[in-house]
């Protein structure tokens, strides 16, 4: 089962789980994904060992989608 997780102060929180053959679960995951993007989170998926890329559309076929805040500092 695929997961949508948000990196946060607790480490991470699972926001949704889905299987591509479960339309209701996919729709719930898409809604959670869009809500977090609207709050300013960035969505990342793994593209290989030690590599990831940012996504702006929900990747139904991904095993894990990680949401994180942009890096900030000064």
Predicted feature residues:
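Ubiquitin-like/PB1-type beta-grasp interaction modules and other compact soluble beta-rich domains
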Residues: 1-72
